[in-house]
Amino acid sequence: MAAAPSAGGVGEGSSSSAAAAAAAAAATIGPHVVDEEAMWQMNLGEAMEAGPYPERIGEPDCSYYMRTGLCRFGMTCKFNHPADRKMAVAAARMKGEYPQRIGQPECQYYLKTGTCKFGATCKFHHPREKAAIATRVQLNALGYPLRPNEKECAYYLRTGQCKFGSTCKFHHPQPSNTMVAVRGSVYSPGQSVTSPSQHTYPGAVTNWPLSRSASFIASPRWPGHSSYAQVIVPPGLVQVPGWNPYAAQIGSSSSDDQQRTAGGAQYYTGSRHSETPNMGDQGMFSSYQAGSVPLGLYTVQRESIFPERPDQPECQFYMKTGDCKFGAVCKFHHPKERIIPTPNCALSSLGLPLRPGEPICTFYSRYGICKFGPNCKFDHPMGTVMYGLATSPTGDVSARRMLAPVPAHSEVSPDNVSGRSRRITHSDSQQIPSGERGTEREAS
């Protein structure tokens, strides 16, 4: 009975001795660790205090101090610590002084533009001798930098503008001619006129001396009345036979066709258009022969706003249509002398291809024009005009029959193609519109 308590006392004493040993170990290790951490935190606190820092005139500014206002090295720092840090940063930016940190990578933005938005707080090296060369970059006519060894600015090539201005690191090629941008479209400025009666065109583009006889030809890209400024042509008005913007691209096989085309000639003037019944009364209009330029020859533009880049590929859209929506900022080549390929089909009086077996050109069916001209791969029917023109001696008989004018119900008219007389059949009468059919019933 007496031995049990002694055993329990022995066990209890051993556990207490173990706890005492652990406490002694903690006492020997804990304070040392605590003191080391406290000393580290104290050193950091002392280093980050806004205490006095050495001003070393002539030495580079302490970059960490310039950014944060603190310095962990304190009085032992070998760099300069201006008393008024904010004022020093502002003065450095105004003077264009940037830190020279030999051994650090060079600031690429500073080398290309001569400026640095971080100023004295930038952690990279800013060599002054290289910056002097970079700041002498040449500017183009629009005020954007010319950097031939760099890539071309894609945004500038598309829009003609660059939001980075003279600080852009890419190349901005010189525009070929002086341009006037009107709502995203580029036009060459109007030519001065020697006529005594001049006035200023009160449109989107001002201060253009123009004659009262100046003509306005709408661009084929914007049919009808458009919100875009129309192209202004010099006083020698260009006659457009039968609303034909492709007159210089088509040839006529007979003089009769030229006379017919000239008889119904139309002009684009300051108003929408005015018809001229004959060519005898021309007035101030200059003479112009339709189809005077044969097919397959060179057509030379009198004034072009499209750039010539011989070392670049040719602009395919320009080679097909003679137009380019990018204007003077297009990065492809636009030769002044453009070979007009000879079309492999007959052309209408508008200079558009007649392809009876192909689908009808959607743009032509809506607006009556086609920007692709003779190179369009779709059909451009003339409505009631037959395909059997002088330029198409071997036309399709079915197409002629469908497009030939339909005579009255009880009349017999000669067939313009075969020379035979025929009476309108039931199938032909089904093609007559309901309005004409009702008119025929009333007439009968």
Swiss-Prot record:
What the entry lists under SMART domains is as follows: ZnF_C3H1
Q: GO molecular function of the protein, one example?
A: DNA binding
Q: Is Ribonucleoprotein included in the keywords of this UniProt record? A: no
Extract the ranges annotated as region (Disordered). 251-276, 405-444
- The answer to whether keyword Metal-binding applies is yes
Positions annotated as zinc finger (C3H1-type): 56-84, 101-129, 147-175, 309-337, 355-383
Q: Which UniProt keywords apply?
A: DNA-binding, Metal-binding, Repeat, Zinc, Zinc-finger
PROSITE patterns of this UniProt entry? Answer: ZF_C3H1
Which InterPro entries does the record associate with it?
Plant_ZF_CCCH (IPR050974), Znf_CCCH (IPR000571), Znf_CCCH_sf (IPR036855)
Q: Which residues form a coiled coil?
A: none
Q: What is this protein called?
A: Zinc finger CCCH domain-containing protein 63
From what organism does this protein derive?
A: Oryza sativa subsp. japonica (Rice)
